[in-house]
Amino acid sequence: MVLGSTNIPWTLDGNIINTFQKKLYISLPECDARKKMIELNLKDITHTLSDQQIEYLAQNTKDFSGSDIYSLVQDAAYEPIRKYMNYEYFKKIPGTNGNQWNYIPCEQNDEGAIKMKMTEIPDSKSILLPKVDFDDFKKTLERTRPTMKEQDLTNFEKFTLEFGKEIK
């Protein structure tokens, strides 16, 4: 058995196309599948998203591939770090997760404020990052676009009508 895969099947030579008995088109994930993908990608990320917020994300990621959804979740997971990179003052608080101390951002006039950038904190594991929240996702969603273009989808549909079978 020979299995082949391509994201541009319409560019293949006719002889190669005819070599394969079955040509299957696996379409982009629908809303329920996108929701499951988001939930799966969130499983190791500390977050505050509700089921309704995850549903909102699933509904607003039409035309996103599985890879696009993975990138969206990973990008949103970095938002708290991006926020912390802008702070100029941190203070120590009693530690969690086995750390003697944790560092959190603060204002210059806060008691215990130490002038330093996040990159200057002695032990990066002692930085207490906030949980990823819905605002982080909304911000990320604003700048993230699906990688699949409308013309590509049209080409897939034409190829599937002529040669293959669609799997949803």
Report each predicted region and the residues it spans.
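Conserved nucleotide-binding/hydrolysis micro-motifs of P-loop NTPases
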Residues: 7-11, 28-33, 42-45, 63, ...
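C-terminal engagement/docking regions of AAA+ P-loop ATPases
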Residues: 1-3, 10, 59, 64-70, ...
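Non-catalytic, surface-exposed connector residues within folded enzymatic/regulatory domains
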Residues: 14, 48-51, 131, 150
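Conserved AAA+ ATPase core "coupling" helix
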Residues: 1, 13-43, 52-56, 71
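Residue-level signature of catalytic and energy-coupling elements of molecular machines
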Residues: 6, 20, 34, 65, ...
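Generic alpha-helical segment signature
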Residues: 5, 31, 47-50, 130
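Conserved AAA+ ATPase "sensor/coupling" helix adjacent to the nucleotide-binding pocket
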Residues: 36-48, 56, 60, 75-83
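Core residues of folded domains in eukaryotic genome-function proteins
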Residues: 22, 74-77, 128
